[in-house]
Amino acid sequence: DLKTIKALLPYLVAFTVPEDRDSEDFWMSDYDLYQKIVEGSYKDGFALVVEVSNQVLATALVSFRDEILSGNPSSHLEVIVVHPEYHGTGLAQNLLEVCENRAKEGGAHCMTLHAYHKNTRARSFYEKLNYCGEFLRYRKVL
């Protein structure tokens, strides 16, 4: 159900966003991708949902794309979010492992992701799972 997924996505922004940003901007395009997957108009990725007793506990969204430097087949973790009541249960790690395995089965050589620099909790999680930072994006309001 897209409504329950949409209700979970704002938890992606569990950090202070800059004053000139709207927190909804951090997840609304992801919701648009979920809609396209449900409609069947997006074929270059997959979504996974963890649901128990009609309650969505977690979700992940992965797209397939060429790796930015090598051009090799790759995957990109667009979303992984767990309801706060289930933080620390291992659910995110298990869900990410399923995503990685499915991406590998789909031909991806690696998985990339973006993490906001102030989201230290997410960055620590990814680094613990052997993801390494490669790029730092800079932005200036004009």
Predicted features, each with a name:
Residues 93, 109, 117-135, 140:
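Conserved active-site alpha-helix within GNAT-family acetyltransferase domains
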Residues 71-84, 136-139:
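Conserved acetyl-CoA binding element of GNAT-fold acetyltransferases
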Residues 96, 103-114:
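Conserved GNAT acetyl-CoA-binding A-motif
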Residues 79-82, 88-101, 124, 128:
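Conserved acetyl-CoA-binding loop-helix of GNAT-fold acetyltransferases
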Residues 49, 55-64, 76, 81:
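Conserved beta-strand in the GNAT
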Residues 36-49, 76:
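A short helix-loop-beta-strand connector motif used in the catalytic cores of GNAT acetyltransferases and
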Residues 1-7:
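A short beta-loop-alpha structural element at the N-terminal edge
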Residues 13-36:
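Conserved GNAT-fold acetyl-CoA-binding loop/helix
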